[in-house]
């Protein structure tokens, strides 16, 4: 990694596009232990603070005619609640707080990461893998607690012909265990790829002939990234809802 | 500019992004074709649209991940 990071002259870029994802300690240098405050810690804390500020301050006035922050808070609440209710049904609504937390954290972390010179915690597989594994274990344990061994019916496709069912069971089993992998990599990969593309165009801006094109490209990519930030948070949340529905109603 | 086989492999893995683009385009195009025939049913199916796009896109992201691994981890 170090040789690529300093390889400015060989690639023609002023900086390496992946340098923005390096985790650094906030104070001084030295090794990073688990308790060291890093830039990842800072931006995760900032996004949690932003969520709390939006939801607590937004709903504190309880105006009949909502102001701007209250509208945003109510809109996001209603949006997620409707999603959970549509996909998981009425009995899934009690898991709404967890899903709301996931969505708000991801979407705010994604948006804060779009501020220039900031750091994007959701671009790290370590962050998204923890969230995806938490969903995976929660959903699996919930499925067994709610349905007992009937949860295994998720893998036994009773609508298929009997001869096909063992093969389908193996496929379903594999796809079930790949879920946390694809769930986490989708979010981190999208965010990381988007930010890297912006940095690649920013590197081209140093070349005089290309700079107008690259500035235009950065503007366009930035607009796309705002969209992607929201859509990936939405997709992460909606897939959590789908997995939760599988746990609550495992029959095919 | 030096390079080795890993860089060629990373470039080849980028083809996967194009394949994912075909998949995502298929999903969105078919959704639009269906939505224009029956616009009243379209709004209720946007969640399905995004799930389909997410599944198609995940495999392209896997290709991107392979490219990243070849660039930085091998």
UniProtKB/Swiss-Prot annotation, chain B:
| Residue stretches spanning the membrane | 5-25, 49-69
Predominant cellular place of this UniProt entry's protein? membrane
According to its UniProt record, where is this protein located? Cell inner membrane
A molecular function GO annotation: lipid binding
Source species, domain of life: Bacteria
What is the membrane topology listed in the Swiss-Prot or TrEMBL record? Multi-pass membrane protein
Q: Keywords assigned by UniProt?
A: ATP synthesis, Cell inner membrane, Cell membrane, CF(0), Hydrogen ion transport, Ion transport, Lipid-binding, Membrane, Transmembrane, Transmembrane helix, Transport
The positions annotated as site (Reversibly protonated during proton transport) read 57
One GO CC annotation: proton-transporting ATP synthase complex
Instruction: Output the InterPro entries linked to this UniProt entry.
Output: ATP_synth_F0_csu, ATP_synth_F0_csu_sf, ATPase_proteolipid_c-like_dom, F/V-ATP_Csub_sf
HAMAP family the UniProt entry points to: ATP_synth_c_bact (MF_01396)
User: What is known about what this protein does?
Assistant: F(1)F(0) ATP synthase produces ATP from ADP in the presence of a proton or sodium gradient. F-type ATPases consist of two structural domains, F(1) containing the extramembraneous catalytic core and F(0) containing the membrane proton channel, linked together by a central stalk and a peripheral stalk. During catalysis, ATP synthesis in the catalytic domain of F(1) is coupled via a rotary mechanism of the central stalk subunits to proton translocation. Key component of the F(0) channel; it plays a direct role in translocation across the membrane. A homomeric c-ring of between 10-14 subunits forms the central stalk rotor element with the F(1) delta and epsilon subunits.
Q: How does it assemble?
A: F-type ATPases have 2 components, F(1) - the catalytic core - and F(0) - the membrane proton channel. F(1) has five subunits: alpha(3), beta(3), gamma(1), delta(1), epsilon(1). F(0) has three main subunits: a(1), b(2) and c(10-14). The alpha and beta chains form an alternating ring which encloses part of the gamma chain. F(1) is attached to F(0) by a central stalk formed by the gamma and epsilon chains, while a peripheral stalk is formed by the delta and b chains.
What family does the Swiss-Prot or TrEMBL record give for this protein? Belongs to the ATPase C chain family.
In its UniProt entry, what is this protein called?
Answer: ATP synthase subunit c
């Amino acid at each position: 990694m170090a040789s690529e990071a300093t390889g400015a002259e060989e690639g023609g870029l002023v900086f390496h596009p992946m340098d923005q994802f390096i985790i650094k300690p906030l104070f001084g240098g030295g090794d990073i232990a688990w308790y060291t405050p890093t830039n990842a810690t800072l931006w995760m804390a900032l996004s949690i603070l932003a969520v709390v500020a939006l939801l607590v301050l937004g709903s504190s006035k309880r105006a009949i005619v909502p102001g701007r922050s209250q509208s945003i808070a109510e809109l996001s609440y209603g949006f997620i609640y409707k999603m959970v209710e549509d996909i998981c049904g009425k009995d899934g609504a009690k898991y709404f707080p967890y899903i709301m937390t996931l969505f708000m954290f991801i979407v705010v972390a994604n948006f804060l990461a779009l501020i220039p010179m900031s750091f994007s915690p959701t671009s790290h597989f370590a962050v998204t893998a923890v969230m995806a594994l938490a969903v995976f274990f929660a959903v699996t344990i919930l499925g067994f607690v709610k349905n007992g061994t009937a949860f295994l019916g998720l893998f036994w496709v009773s609508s298929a012909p009997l001869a096909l069912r063992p093969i389908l069971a193996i496929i379903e089993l594999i796809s079930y265990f790949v879920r946390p992998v694809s769930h986490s990599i989708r979010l981190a990969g999208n965010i990381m790829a988007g930010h890297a593309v912006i940095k690649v165009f920013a590197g081209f801006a140093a070349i005089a002939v290309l700079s107008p094109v690259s500035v235009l490209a950065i503007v366009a990519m930035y607009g796309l990234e705002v969209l992607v930030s929201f859509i990936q948070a939405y997709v992460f949340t909606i897939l959590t809802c789908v997995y939760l529905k599988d746990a609550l109603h495992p029959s095919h | 500019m030096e390079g080795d086989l890993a860089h060629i492999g990373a470039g080849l893995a980028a083809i996967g992004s194009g394949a994912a683009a075909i998949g995502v385009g298929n999903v969105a195009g078919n959704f639009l074709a269906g939505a224009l025939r029956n616009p009243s049913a379209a709004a209720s199916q946007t969640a399905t649209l995004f799930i389909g796009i997410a599944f198609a896109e995940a495999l392209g992201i896997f290709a991107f991940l392979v490219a990243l691994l070849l660039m930085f981890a091998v």
